[in-house]
Amino acid sequence: MVSSCCGSVCSDQGCGLETCCRPSCCQTTCCRTTCCRPSCCVSSCCRPQCCQSVCCQPTCCRPSCCPSCCQTTCCRTTCCRPSCCVSSCCRPQCCQSVCCQPTCCRPSCSISSCCRPSCCVSRCCRSQCCQSVCCQPTCCRPSCCISSCCRPSCCESSCCRPCCCRPCCCLRPVCGRVSCHTTCYRPTCVISTCPRPLCCASSCC
């Protein structure tokens, strides 16, 4: 029984035995739960029932194996799903839009497809992530100060740039030393009691 099962041809009778868990027995018809071992992790055995933690190898990284195979060695583009967004899987090849979670917000993951509000943490604030949907107080940094991010929540002192000098940014005392209620809408923005000169653009005076 063992010899007939662990040969080149696998039958359904005895393929699930632990004694059959050999590389020669890792056929498509022999992929059982009991056969899910590292030596059996070939491409033909990559099925949901074979996606155990011990069988998480790069050759087994397929969509059907995510999320139970979200290990460092199984972080592939095909495995980039929200359930797979653990810290060990935060790599550039896993930074797809469907895999953009707070746990994956790392500098290496800061690509344009990952610019979502859930990914707007301080360590993910880069220029390519400064879109209008990603303009949060935690992302208000000089590198994030582009025109699309000019909102009241992004008008902090560290983000006070000419491109961010808009009327919506002149409503709170965050763009200078004093309040911007009245002095920011006047041509006399260059006096000492008003905000910084670089915040006194024509659109903000």
From Swiss-Prot:
Record-linked InterPro entries: KAP
Quaternary assembly: Interacts with hair keratins.
Family affiliation: Belongs to the KRTAP type 4 family.
GO cellular component labels: cytosol; keratin filament
Expression (tissue specificity): Expressed in the hair follicles.
Stretches forming Sequence repeats: 20-24, 25-29, 30-34, 35-39, 40-44, 45-49, 50-54, 55-59, 60-64, 65-68, 69-73, 74-78, 79-83, 84-88, 89-93, 94-98, 99-103, 104-108, 114-118, 119-123, 124-128, 129-133, 134-138, 139-143, 144-148, 149-153, 154-158, 159-163, 164-168, 169-173
Name of the protein described by the UniProt record: Keratin-associated protein 4-6
ATP-binding as UniProt keyword: no
Pfam families for the chain: Keratin_B2_2
Coiled-coil parts of chain: none
Gene transcribed to yield this protein: KRTAP4-6
Organism listed in the record: Homo sapiens (Human)
Reported function: In the hair cortex, hair keratin intermediate filaments are embedded in an interfilamentous matrix, consisting of hair keratin-associated proteins (KRTAP), which are essential for the formation of a rigid and resistant hair shaft through their extensive disulfide bond cross-linking with abundant cysteine residues of hair keratins. The matrix proteins include the high-sulfur and high-glycine-tyrosine keratins.
Alphabetic keyword roster: Keratin, Repeat
The keyword Repeat belongs to this UniProt entry's keyword annotation: yes
Record region (30 X 5 AA repeats of C-C-[IRQVEL]-[SPTR]-[STVQRCP]): 20-173
Highest rank taxon of the organism: Eukaryota
